[in-house]
C-alpha cells in the first residue's frame, strides 16, 4: 500500500512537472509568435507607400500601381483619390503622404517653396528636386446618353446657357476642372455667378462627381476631362482649345515629409516607364515624361 501510494505520488509530481514545462513552452511559443507577428507588421508598414492623386487618375494610376506592386514584392500602395484642392489641404494639415500628383500646377505650386508662382510662403511640403510634369489631359464637353438638349459644342453650350435652355455641370472653384471651366466661361464672356443664381449651373466637389451628374443625366451637359469621359464611356461633343482654358498639365512629386522617401522616388521613376505610360494612354492621357 505504501509502495502504491509512493508510485502514485511520484506519477503526480511527474505529471505536474510535465504540465508546467508544457505550459512554459506554450507561453514562450506564444510570445515568439507575437514577436514574429509584430516584426512582420513592422515590415509591412515599412513598405507601405501613400499616394495622394487627382480623382481623374483613379482608374489609370490604380492599374499602374498594381504593376509596380507586382514588380516590387512586399510593397503596398495606399491611394487617396480626390480633388487636388482637397488633397492639398490634407497635406497642409499634416496627413501622411509620400507622393502627390495634382491635376493642376496651382495646387502643387502652393505647397512648393521653390515654385515661381502661386506659392504660399508659409507652406513648404514638396521635395522640389523630385518634381516633374507627368501627364497632359484635355478638357471636354460631354452630354448624357441621346443628348436630350442637342448640345453640339462649346459654342452651342454658351448660346444655350445664355438663353437659359440648359443646366451645366462643372467643378467647384477650388477644383482644377472647375478652374478650367471658369476660364471657358470667361472666354465666352458668360457671368458664372449670374448663371448659378438663375439655376443654370450645378457644381461638383471633384471631376468624378461632375462625371456622375452627366452619366445620370441630372445635367444637360458637363465639362470634364477627356480621361474621365473615356473611362465612363460618355459622349464627348467638343474639346477645349489651349486658347480657351490653357494646357491641362499634371505635376508629380514626393513630399518633404515622406516616410518612404526612397520608395516614393522609385515609384515616380516607374511612372515614366512604358508600362505605366500604357495605363495612362489607354484612357486618353498624354505622358510628358518617359524613362
Feature locations, PLM:
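N-terminal secretory signal peptides
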Residues: 1-7, 14-25
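Exported/periplasmic ABC-transporter solute-binding proteins
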Residues: 2-4, 29-70, 76, 85, ...
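Residue-level marker of structural boundaries
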Residues: 10, 21-22, 117, 190, ...
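Positively charged, low-complexity intrinsically disordered regions
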Residues: 10-11, 42
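Short, well-ordered coil loops that connect the C-terminus of an alpha-helix to the N-terminus
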Residues: 74-75, 97
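Short beta-strand-centered segments that line the small-molecule binding cleft or hinge
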Residues: 88, 94-122, 128-132
Amino acid at each position: 500500500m505504501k509502495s502504491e501510494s509512493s508510485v502514485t505520488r511520484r506519477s503526480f509530481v511527474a505529471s505536474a512537472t510535465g504540465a508546467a514545462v508544457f505550459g512554459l513552452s506554450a507561453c514562450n511559443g506564444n510570445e515568439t509568435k507575437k514577436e514574429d507577428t509584430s516584426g512582420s507588421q513592422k515590415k509591412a508598414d515599412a513598405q507601405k507607400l501613400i499616394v495622394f492623386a487627382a480623382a481623374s487618375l483613379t482608374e489609370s494610376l490604380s492599374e499602374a500601381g498594381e504593376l509596380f506592386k507586382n514588380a516590387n514584392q512586399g510593397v503596398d500602395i495606399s491611394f487617396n483619390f480626390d480633388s487636388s484642392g482637397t488633397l492639398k489641404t490634407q497635406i497642409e494639415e499634416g496627413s501622411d503622404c509620400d507622393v502627390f500628383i495634382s491635376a493642376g500646377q496651382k495646387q502643387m505650386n502652393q505647397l512648393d517653396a521653390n515654385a515661381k508662382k502661386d506659392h504660399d510662403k508659409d507652406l513648404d511640403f514638396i521635395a522640389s528636386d523630385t518634381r516633374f510634369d507627368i501627364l497632359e489631359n484635355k478638357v471636354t464637353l460631354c452630354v448624357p446618353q441621346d443628348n436630350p438638349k442637342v448640345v453640339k459644342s462649346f459654342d452651342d453650350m454658351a448660346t444655350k446657357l445664355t438663353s437659359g435652355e440648359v443646366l451645366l455641370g462643372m467643378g467647384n472653384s477650388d477644383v482644377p476642372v472647375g478652374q478650367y471651366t471658369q476660364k471657358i466661361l470667361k472666354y465666352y464672356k458668360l457671368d458664372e455667378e449670374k448663371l448659378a443664381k438663375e439655376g443654370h449651373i450645378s457644381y461638383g466637389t471633384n471631376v468624378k462627381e461632375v462625371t456622375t451628374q452627366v452619366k445620370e443625366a441630372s445635367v444637360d451637359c458637363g465639362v470634364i476631362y477627356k480621361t474621365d469621359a473615356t473611362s465612363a464611356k460618355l459622349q464627348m461633343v467638343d474639346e477645349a482649345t489651349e486658347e480657351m482654358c490653357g494646357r491641362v498639365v499634371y505635376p508629380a512629386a514626393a513630399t518633404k515629409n515622406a516616410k518612404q522617401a526612397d520608395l516614393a522616388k522609385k515609384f515616380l521613376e516607374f511612372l515614366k516607364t512604358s508600362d505605366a505610360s500604357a495605363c495612362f494612354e489607354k484612357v486618353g492621357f498624354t505622358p510628358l515624361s518617359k524613362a
